[in-house]
Amino acid sequence: MPRRFSSLFRQHLDPFTRAWADEVYADRRTDLATLLTFRELVEHVPEVLEELGRLLDERADAEEICEGARRLRGYARVRFHQGVLIDEVARELMLLRGTLFEFLWQEARGLTEDDPRLLRDALRRAEIFFDELLVEAVLVYASSLRPVVPTRGSVWPPPRRRRQP
């Protein structure tokens, strides 16, 4: 299949990134604008769009999309170490998803004129992808904040106990 979405994302990377950053700066529900430099804020966008473009071009199934999101787990780790709160990461990803959907409605129609179902399928795959990115962020934050607790080994089935007379 031609690399239509990947090349579309590459062609419009800078204006897309600026549009998304403007959304982040305008959103008063996060401190991302004061917490991160512009470079820190946007450094993950090319990698996210590259992975998503590949998944859309290949018409990936849900399992492949989950694996693609898992490969981007480093994004959530970086945000955790930068001191970004989990709700801010979630808001950041929601804004990125919204900006991407707006972009796809405006720009991808030309790619899918022959079959409008392609755009619908791309939007559905993108939605799954961003849901999985949120899941990965929650997992990273949960595992990073969890205290180290010693665990005992498990034996199954448990040994039989003798009855006490």
Task: Give the role of each language-model region.
Residues 1-87:
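N-terminal low-complexity or simple alpha-helical regulatory segments
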Residues 2-8, 60, 64-165:
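Long, amphipathic alpha-helical coupling/dimerization segments that relay conformational signals between
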